[in-house]
Amino acid sequence: MSRYRGPRVRIIRRLGTLPGLTSKTPESKPSYINQSTSSRKISQYRIRLEEKQKLRFHYGITERQLLKYVRIARKAKGSTGQVLLQLLEMRLDNIIFRLGLAPTIPGARQLVNHRHVLVNDCTVDIPSFRCKPQDVITIRDRQKSQNLMKRSRDSYEKYGIPNHLTFNSVQNIGLVNETIDRDWIGLKINELLVVEYYSRQA
């Protein structure tokens, strides 16, 4: 399954707020619609499917990529669900987004693909590159690169940066301090339901 490129508002109307996909928030539905939908019995499969879709659309990854991350998480020590979230959060495109260097994860992926991003002073153009503690993230010292970063930083300041990252706004340097803690994921998600969804495939 390919990466979604359709209307983003349609997705957040169905799944709720997904800051990685879009900064927009879903409009509240009229009460009569909420009453009619709440009276329907929702299957457990659909609940798990929607949690899985939240991860896919928020992080902007394909079905195949998500399944791959689930398989890696299953082999790691610790809670499979939490390891899965940590793997997704440590992707370079997500780190760029969480540092406020891009307005969304798709925007961050563009920065990486177009070679605007340096990790430890080396150009990295792979959005799925897995960052690790003590990695230093910078934007290339080119006018276009710096302008893209500045526009995003100006609009992102109100959200703040999670505690596993640091950004020096004077030198424009981001630092990965540690692996992210579950409390700082910033996405309303039940990761255990995602693991259950893939229980027969992973």
UniProtKB/Swiss-Prot annotation:
Coiled coil: none
Gene3D superfamilies, alphabetized: Ribosomal Protein S4 Delta 41, Chain A, domain 1, RNA-binding S4 domain
One of the record's GO cellular component terms: small ribosomal subunit
Any single biological process term in GO: ribosomal small subunit biogenesis
SMART domains named among the record's database cross-references: Ribosomal_S4 (SM01390), S4 (SM00363)
rRNA-binding as UniProt keyword: yes
Classification via InterPro entries: Ribosomal_uS4, Ribosomal_uS4_bac-type, Ribosomal_uS4_CS, Ribosomal_uS4_N, S4_RNA-bd, S4_RNA-bd_sf
Top-level taxonomic group: Eukaryota
Main localisation: plastid
PANTHER family: 30S 40S RIBOSOMAL PROTEIN, SMALL RIBOSOMAL SUBUNIT PROTEIN US4M
Family label: Belongs to the universal ribosomal protein uS4 family.
Name of the protein this chain belongs to: Small ribosomal subunit protein uS4c
Lineage: Eukaryota, Viridiplantae, Streptophyta, Embryophyta, Anthocerotophyta
Gene: rps4
